[in-house]
């Protein structure tokens, strides 16, 4: 439950060492380098755009080559591959890649060229297939496509509107020129768009025949070839077979290159590291002979960073407290159990300047409320075992994913405990199975009470847990006020609300309204009733008189105080939000019981048992998934809106040290490489 203390560091060294020092800082991964430094007359930024662009282009090319290999030679992966983590690379592996990077660059280029050639062949196949489809209506024509005629005849090859026959076309000609002779018309094929035809006429009448045909939609074919349509189609099919064979050969060549997949991944990450280095190099201030690096380092890492730099370089490292007017980046540190909830906090926002880290109390409430919403012992056991097994089996999974699984593992334990308290084990599975198949009813009795038998009791305790949650947020606000030494804010903004809300709750408890809801009657002694009145009145008076204490105008102060009292409606709204604990808790149990009843409808025979098992598996998997999602969403909502709304704003920037950011591999040790 802590924000790790941060220090500011400034490093000044000779310009000739700038690349080596940056590489050492990158391998250490402990210093966040500021990139928004202002230039002066003596210290200016050096443009590294061309060098950075060069390495980014190499990253892009190598990533593209890997995608090509994955496309044509997919890697066999298990369904849990995403949990296995990235492969590790040692310093020796990096040095091997550096030594052979030019050979690998040529391989990358070759892979890209092969991919382009394959794409060209695939386009050629499409082109040939389109041509074959276009020639299909002409296959019955037994003369070359480019035939224009003989010494005494003209040949007109073309198309007319669809649906015409030879009789129709000859009718067009005879009706226009009844006396004309010396021609013939043959329809060789047709489709939905055209009628394919050949007209042969002696030269003396061919021009007139064509004019008549054109008046009825005739168009000469624009395709020319010395082959017949059938011969041309055979040629295209041969070309397709040749393209396909060539593609197959090139694919096999790519498959043979897949053995270098891991090397190319390491190469891409090496170039990615180099690109990051030049990006930072272009942001630091440099003079003619020196350069300056400004940044942040965790207080615990200061001695190591300074010692490593002084051991290898001649430089000056100045470490000092972060100035008051600067917001230092945030790095959280919590016990492993509570650190699992840091992702929930980060989704809302890291602590701002002067704020505490609320991870630990938030994690306690998160885990407890999640279990209360799901509240089935069997579901909790399944969640716990699934997450526990995955964490143990895949210890190298990504840190963020491991934290999430660890959080759900603890939520599973909470769900198991609440399920035992409420008597839920796959709903009423034990009762239904014993009654249906063994004809003797056995029940899984709740340790506390069954929510379905007493929903108002669950509602009452849901609101009680909500009040504890809200008071927890208000208490943390008070803690931050006292930590800053602001006793006035503690009394006026925290203690006053504790007094008012506590007084109002104590005033409500002996009433008939509360008794009708809670199904229990409270009879307070007179002194306790008077105490509740006093708490409410004093708390309200402090709020009214002190909420606007920053303003000197008494009327404005009073108006602001009265407006702040109106925030009681906000407290009521927040408190009623916890009725979702009742709704989700009941929903899980009701749906589970319905599933069990549906499964038992087929009776107690073999067929009934088979039906029950199928309905049980499908139904409870669905119920677990949908209610687990609901519990996750609504638990997050209660943290973000109700809990954080009482004390926490967030807005801090995460600590992002300059390190070897990679995509494919985890580098187990730093490397020192010179360009």
Regions found by a protein language model. Name each.
Residues 1-362, 390, 401-405:
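Long, charged N-terminal accessory/stalk domains
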């Amino acid at each position: 439950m802590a924000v790790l203390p941060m220090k500011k560091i400034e490093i000044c060294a000779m310009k000739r060492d700038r690349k080596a020092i940056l590489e050492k800082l990158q391998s250490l991964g402990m210093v966040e380098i500021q990139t928004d430094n202002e230039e002066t007359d003596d210290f200016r930024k050096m443009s590294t755009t061309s060098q950075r662009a060069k390495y980014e282009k190499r990253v892009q090319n190598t990533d593209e080559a890997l995608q090509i290999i994955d496309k044509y030679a997919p890697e066999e992966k298990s369904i849990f591959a995403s949990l296995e983590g990235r492969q590790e690379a040692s310093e020796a592996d990096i040095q091997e890649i550096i030594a052979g990077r030019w050979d690998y660059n040529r391989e990358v280029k070759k892979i890209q060229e092969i991919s382009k050639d394959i794409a060209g062949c695939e386009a050629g196949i499409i082109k040939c297939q389109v041509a074959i489809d276009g020639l299909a209506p002409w296959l019955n024509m037994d003369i070359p496509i480019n035939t224009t005629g003989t010494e005494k005849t003209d040949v007109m090859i073309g198309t007319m509107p669809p649906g015409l026959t030879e009789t129709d076309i000859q009718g067009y000609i005879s009706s226009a020129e009844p006396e004309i002779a010396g021609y013939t018309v043959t329809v060789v094929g047709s489709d939905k768009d055209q009628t394919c035809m050949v007209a042969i006429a002696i030269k003396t009448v061919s021009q007139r025949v064509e004019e008549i045909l054109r008046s009825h939609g005739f168009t000469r074919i624009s395709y020319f070839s010395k082959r017949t349509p059938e011969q041309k189609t055979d040629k295209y099919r041969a070309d397709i077979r040749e393209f396909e064979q060539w593609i197959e050969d090139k694919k096999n060549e790519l498959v043979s290159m897949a053995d270098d997949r891991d090397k190319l991944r390491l190469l891409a990450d090496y170039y990615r590291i180099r690109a990051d280095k030049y990006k930072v190099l272009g942001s630091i201030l440099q003079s003619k002979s020196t350069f300056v690096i400004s940044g942040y380092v965790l207080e615990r890492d200061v001695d190591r960073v300074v010692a490593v730099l002084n051991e290898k370089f001649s430089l000056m490292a100045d470490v000092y407290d972060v100035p008051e007017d600067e917001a230092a980046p945030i790095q959280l540190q919590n016990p492993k159990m509570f650190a699992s909830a840091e992702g929930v906090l980060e989704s809302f926002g890291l602590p701002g300047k002067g704020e505490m880290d609320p991870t630990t109390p938030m994690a306690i409430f998160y885990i407890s409320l999640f279990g209360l919403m799901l509240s089935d012992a069997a579901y909790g056991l399944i969640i716990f075992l699934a997450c526990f097994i995955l964490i143990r089996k895949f210890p190298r999974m990504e840190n963020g994913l491991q934290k999430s699984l660890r959080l759900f593992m603890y939520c599973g334990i909470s769900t198991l405990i609440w399920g035992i308290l409420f008597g839920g084990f796959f709903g009423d599975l034990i009762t239904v199975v014993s009654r249906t198949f063994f004809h003797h009813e056995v029940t899984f009795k709740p340790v506390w009470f069954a929510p379905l038998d007493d929903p108002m009791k669950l509602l009452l305790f849901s609101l009680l847990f909500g009040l504890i949650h809200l008071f927890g947020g208000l208490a943390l606000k008070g803690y931050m006020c006292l930590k800053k030494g602001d006793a006035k804010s503690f009394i006026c903004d925290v203690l006053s609300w504790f007094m008012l809300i506590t007084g109002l709750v104590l005033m409500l408890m002996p009433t008939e309204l509360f008794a009708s809801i809670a199904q229990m009657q409270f009879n307070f002694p007179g002194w306790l009733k008077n105490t509740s009145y006093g708490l409410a009145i004093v708390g309200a008076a402090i709020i009214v008189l002190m909420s606007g204490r920053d303003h000197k105008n008494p009327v404005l102060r009073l108006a602001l105080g009265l407006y702040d009292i109106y925030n009681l409606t906000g407290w009521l709204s927040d408190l009623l939000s916890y009725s979702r604990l009742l709704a989700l808790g009941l929903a899980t149990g009701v749906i589970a019981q319905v599933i069990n009843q549906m499964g038992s409808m087929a009776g107690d025979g073999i067929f009934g048992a088979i039906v029950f098992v199928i309905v049980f598996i499908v139904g409870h998997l669905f119920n677990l998934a949908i209610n687990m999602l609901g519990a996750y969403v609504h638990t997050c909502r209660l943290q973000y809106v109700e809990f954080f709304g009482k004390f926490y704003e967030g807005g801090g920037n995460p600590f992002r040290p300059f390190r070897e950011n990679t995509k494919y591999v985890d580098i187990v040790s730093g490397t020192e490489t010179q360009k």
